[in-house]
């Protein structure tokens, strides 16, 4: 069985508006005539850039001797495409480009992308984009970076250096050694930064040739495949196509797939098998006027993007593995089920419910939630249903009566429930993972603050105080005295107790400078009216008194609110509970 080196699969990641799509467009739009030998060809969901085309763009760098046939770029940029494309329990992309705007530096999604790449152990190169936006930059269209750099003034060169070194510093903070590509001697120890401009083409050839060089040096063993082995791939997208019904957009990363092959694939209820009815690829650009946008092919060899038409594809989920079956039907289906079970999602007895459109996206979202210590109770692929909402609605903890939906809709029956307010479930939906998490965390923090505020309003707060000498204004009916708050927060309409725990009266009103106030904090000296006492009988001048806290409130204070109480309030609470716990150790617990 003859082996050959297949084309490495490349994914482009980065922060929104940092130039991912522009970079892909520039690479795809490189001026190579459609139809000539070594032309750039469009695949389903991907673009193949042959080595010959890269060599033409790379000038002197293009003299590199390599067995790597080119680069297969996934057309959809971003985390979503990267996480969707899973293979053998990791990312399908062999190598990635992390796009960073050289003028803006690292942003939220850049850091998120770095974490994903690190988790998946995917090698990557930094493309420092928007080189042409450096103030004073003089473009040299399609030139290598070094040639373009030499054409700049000393001031612009310095500015360029500074911006690259800001990236180097940030990467160092995150545990990566990095350097501009032309200064790197050890590519295993250093992350490569290639400054580029998608607008002018500067540095693009350098970037592509660096990718080829890294693939040649470090990835060739993993890129070995055969033209006769059974095809293995990953479903990028499930699509309805006119005249074809449900189809699968697949990235094939090993072996060969042909019309008539039996294939094993993962559906929502487990692995199933079906037969390839047709294999389709886009027509070349010169044939674009033909009404049928796809052309039928007999077979496809890895690495390639292909559209598959076959029966019974309705339940297939994006991100699932696909394998050609050759006489080992049950074994292949068992292997697919095993791969699906390898998805690493930690579930808890209580937590949020998560929905995503692909397996990889579900895994990525779950990892992000885990990193933020947000427990997950349910995690599944596909739209949110009525059944999901009913299950979530019976959860007791309000903070977990939540559905986080990444890139998935609500089914009509679920939409109707939400519209008619039949269920008390909070739904968060977004197409960007970090925004989805930010929205949930913001809501959760707001809910916690509201709950705490309500507790502070309804729970009797600890306080201790003493009657000031010379400040008895009325002895009884009610007694009116001046007091100093020694700890905690004193409020009206609370009972008061002596040092032996005996309840002796109730504070009716608190005044400061003849104005009625709602509370007095530690250190305040205020006038209070007390019902049910006579000064000199139940209580005396100079005596330390406590707010009488109901036993059930003590439990709430100690288990839910303690971290929000200041030292004086905690001291007052401990002194008051200590009175009762001398004889009843578990009082208020």
Curated annotation (Swiss-Prot):
Binding-site list for GTP: 14-21, 75-79, 129-132
Region of interest: G4: 129-132
Entry GO terms, CC: cytoplasm
Domain tr-type G: 5-219
Gene3D superfamilies: P-loop containing nucleotide triphosphate hydrolases (3.40.50.300), Translation factors (2.40.30.10), Translation initiation factor IF- 2, domain 3 (3.40.50.10050)
Pfam families registered for this protein in UniProt: GTP_EFTU, GTP_EFTU_D4, IF-2
Region (G1): 14-21
GO molecular function, one term: translation initiation factor activity
NCBIfam families: aIF-2, PRK04004.1, small_GTP
Family: Belongs to the TRAFAC class translation factor GTPase superfamily. Classic translation factor GTPase family. IF-2 subfamily.
Job description of the protein: Function in general translation initiation by promoting the binding of the formylmethionine-tRNA to ribosomes. Seems to function along with eIF-2.
Protein's name according to its UniProt entry: Probable translation initiation factor IF-2
Biological source species: Methanocorpusculum labreanum (strain ATCC 43576 / DSM 4855 / Z)
Organism taxonomic ancestry: Archaea, Methanobacteriati, Methanobacteriota, Stenosarchaea group, Methanomicrobia
